[in-house]
Amino acid sequence: MKISQSAIKDFYNEDYCRIKWEEVYFNGYRTQPTPAMVDGLIFEDLTIGSSRGGEKYFIPKLKSGKPSKRELDLIKLSEFAKQTMKDLEIELIEVQPEWETDTLIGHPDALITYKGNKAIMDLKYTGVKEDESCRWNPYAWSDLEYKDFRQALHYVEMYYQKEGEYLTFFYLVFGKSGWVKFISVDITSSALDDYRMLLDTFRADLKSFTPKPIKSYKICRKCPILCNKRTETPNIINIEI
């Protein structure tokens, strides 16, 4: 299999079931996006012209046929995002490409120029507060020293393997409430070396991979993959007094 950054992230996530991992990354099972994910995909489509895979998502209209506040808020934020990109001198070169090398695969949001210089950009829409800390919430965008930046490493490494050039990686993050952050990820050679070692470790670990059930009622009851090894009842907590 060709390695994606999400495959590595989920493989080493203790709360991600091994059976689900096999279904998603080996067998091609596609999970349905949550409402929050749908909002993010619609925001991408409105802002840069496409979401991943070119799929279109829509928010149901009200009974009157008019757009809901949820839809109007996304439209308003996307217009702000487009103006922000213009103000930052960001120009789109390629939107939602699929990149492949001999061993890696990736789907960056956009190849761009920033003030005339080629770069990679990931566009984010989030409902978290501006000052919410990455230390406690992996989806937050404050206290960035705690953020997992393997996504940036993966795409920068891929582009280097494809084109022989290291590009700057940017996150352009828009909060549902209207805040915005433009983050440049300055990747050191040691960070890239560490990521290449992680790729080698992943390849080695994959050889001994066994799709074992996670045995967690909390996780299994929400899982869309109805395997015959799922935990159907709450786990027993034993206590001796």
What is the predicted role of each segment?
Residues 97-98, 115, 123-126, 174-177:
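Histidine- and/or cysteine-centered catalytic micro-motif in compact active-site loops
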Residues 108-138, 155:
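Conserved catalytic cores of phosphodiester-cleaving nucleases, focusing on short active-site segments
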Residues 32, 63-67, 132-146, 185-187:
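Short histidine-centered catalytic/ligand-binding loop motif
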